[in-house]
Amino acid sequence: MVMDLAVELIQATVQLEQPLGDGTRTVGTGFLISSTGPDGQPRTVLVTANHVFQKMPGATARIGYRISNADGSWSYSPQPVKIRDGDGHELWTHHPSRDVAAIAIKAPPEFAKAAIPQSYLAADETFQQYKIGAGDEMMALGFPRGLSANAAGFPILRSGRVASYPIAPAKIFPTFLLDFSVFPGNSGGPVFVSRDAAAVAPASNGDSAPAAGPGFIAGLLTQQVELNNERLEIGIVTQAKYIRETIALLTNPLAPSTVADTTPVPGAKAASAEEAARD
């Protein structure tokens, strides 16, 4: 069971990169989810934004794993993951109407244990259960412009407030806005409500309601909002419903998926892989 979703998601979030051969690299963010494979056995799934993989022209990307050492230090140990076959065909699965991608991977045992259970992906009723709406705080993890929190390669944790209304149901509102500054490299990172954010919810009589639980993953960051080439410091979050559906498509390509409203958010621009981050 997840005890502190912020800490657990920090452990499960990784930098994705691919060198471009000219001294630059394209960078994005991904996170690990634990789900059940077609054989009924547990598997580790890497989730990111579809455009992160699409903007990587090579067959192999690198996942920024982190290895803990006996003395309490950490080592950054990026490992290859194949994202295309020899003919250039995509090996990942993507949602038919939303910017979400998933690929089953064989992670080091330490990282496989860090994967977040799929049950922590939000459903429509989750927002109601936690009383989350416009103005409430959510957290986001990522690697803005390829920058990590330290030499060990941990992601940078930031926060913002829900900036749109309403945010459910996901079929009608497949994305929502988050009031925080987004940079290339952030795309694909998880957006979530932590245990602390949901622990104290006002009751109707003015008292505090019991803790709603350790939190949930609301979705993943996919775009930023720009107007006339000016960044508005607003992120676009794709709802977790579409992560669930993409993972289901890994097992069964005929699994049902929601054809969501595809009307673009004015000024939306992908938040990774459109600019290469220098090493």
Name the predicted role of every residue range:
Residues 1, 6, 22:
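Short, surface-exposed loop/strand segments
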